[in-house]
A protein has these predicted regions:
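Non-heme Fe(II)-dependent double-stranded beta-helix
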Residues: 1-52
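Short, structured patches in soluble enzyme cores that scaffold and shape functional sites
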Residues: 30, 45-47, 62-66, 78
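Short, solvent-exposed loop/turn segments at secondary-structure junctions
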Residues: 31-36, 67-69, 81-82, 136-139, ...
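Short, surface-exposed loop/helix-turn segments at secondary-structure junctions
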Residues: 43-46, 94, 103-117, 147-149, ...
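A short beta-loop-beta micro-motif enriched in histidine and acidic residues
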Residues: 46-57, 118-119, 125, 148-149
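Short, conserved beta-strand element in jelly-roll/cupin
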Residues: 51-69, 124-127, 132, 156-160
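Double-stranded beta-helix
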Residues: 69-140
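Non-heme Fe(II)/2-oxoglutarate
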Residues: 130, 137-211
Length: 211
């Protein structure tokens, strides 16, 4: 569908990606609108921490509706992108293998991944806003208590020398390719129409998103 093509060319998002990542490409994309009573997630980071002083994946949360305290706002722990990764989805682990945490890191780890974390914030913003974070930030969805939409598009971007979460060229259709201009094809890494040489995530056995 072409319905979300405009999300690929939000100038401030692309400028932020270039400023924080350098040469970049699309990493992944999904849409989220939990039903009332649902939407809670365990606290997690989307990617492992591969570079202590460097961004390597960026999250852009594009709000199609107001995000309020009642409709399941995203919770974040400010500054946690400098900490150790936590509860990373298997699909994003790649070649990373966790090391034994230090005593300081162990002290940070929550005993309950579902419980509120000290210092966490609930993000609220108006429709049309975009929230940009480091993908190593500790965060999660929360329960939607109101029966109103909270539609968001999650876009992630990564450096061009690193693999995508979803290798876009593997799912490429001719209508999609034909309607993309040269800049969009470069952004999605679908140009040329050849999967040879595309860097890919290491395959891991898993039964679901997190395990």
């Amino acid at each position: 569908s072409s319905a979300f093509d405009k999300c690929l060319q939000i100038p401030l998002v692309l400028a932020s990606c270039h400023h924080l990542l350098g040469e970049f490409k699309l990493h992944g994309a999904n849409l989220r609108d939990p039903r009332k009573g649902y939407g809670h997630q365990q606290i997690h980071t989307d990617v492992p921490k591969c570079f202590d002083d460097d961004w390597w994946v960026l999250n852009a949360i594009v709000l199609f509706d107001d995000m309020t305290l009642e409709n399941g706002p995203t919770r974040v722990v400010p500054g946690s992108h400098h900490w150790q990764p936590i509860n990373v989805p298997v699909v994003n682990l790649g070649e990373w293998e966790p090391s034994e945490p230090t005593d300081k890191e162990k002290a940070r780890l929550p005993k309950d991944l579902d419980a509120p974390y000290p210092g966490e914030m609930l993000l609220t913003a108006k429709a049309g806003s975009v929230v940009i974070t480091n993908s190593s930030l500790w965060h999660s969805g929360t329960v939607k208590n109101a029966d109103i939409h909270r539609r968001v598009c999650h876009l992630t971007y990564t450096r061009r020398d690193l693999p995508q979460q979803l290798t876009q060229i593997d799912y490429l259709t001719k209508p999609l390719y034909d309607r993309m201009n040269a800049a969009h094809r470069f952004l999605m890494e679908i140009e040329p129409e050849d999967a040879a040489g595309i860097k890919r995530q290491k395959k891991r056995e898993h039964s679901g998103w997190w395990n």
